[in-house]
Amino acid sequence: MDHSIYAGELFMNGSSCSQAVFLAFCDVTGIDRKLAAKIASPFGGGIGRMREVCGAVSGMYMVLGALYGYDETAEDDGRKKQLYKDVQALAAQFREECGSIICREILKNPPSDPNPPPRPAEFYKQRPCARMVVTAARLLDEIIAQHPIEE
């Protein structure tokens, strides 16, 4: 499956940026779609529309954690170090392609109103968010190809 196309479709059909990326990978993470949508919901708009870390980036990291993360019982087997290395590499790639991982910088200082605006067709023409979602999903697919998931 091309997760980047699917993530873009999810975003264009009303999912938030973070939800679109996280939901696009439910086939890989095994996380229930309804639960995934709830987990990702606070991260849209740069975390609750505060315009901090881009929601697509947050969604990307949630997928990364679901696939390669560690839990509180894990011994130090290098997973934490590898995970943080991958987080930083993804951030660098996203910055290189999109200019920033910070929502307010990507959107050129929009208001942080907690009330999301309606999303008519004009919304999608003015915002780069769909491109951020597609980029985040593509970068994730590249990482997954480099680090196949252990069953």
Regions found by a protein language model. Give the residues of each.
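Active-site-proximal helix-loop elements at catalytic-domain edges
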Residues: 1-29
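Conserved alpha-helical segments that form or flank metal/cofactor-binding pockets of metalloenzymes
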Residues: 49-60
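Short cysteine clusters
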Residues: 17, 54, 103
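C-terminal binding/interaction regions
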Residues: 83-151
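DPxDG-like acidic metal-binding loop motif
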Residues: 59-67
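Phosphate-handling active-site elements
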Residues: 28-38, 66-86, 148
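A short glycine/serine-rich beta->alpha loop
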Residues: 5-12, 43-51, 121-126
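Acidic-glycine-rich active-site phosphate/pyrophosphate-binding loop
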Residues: 24-42, 106-113
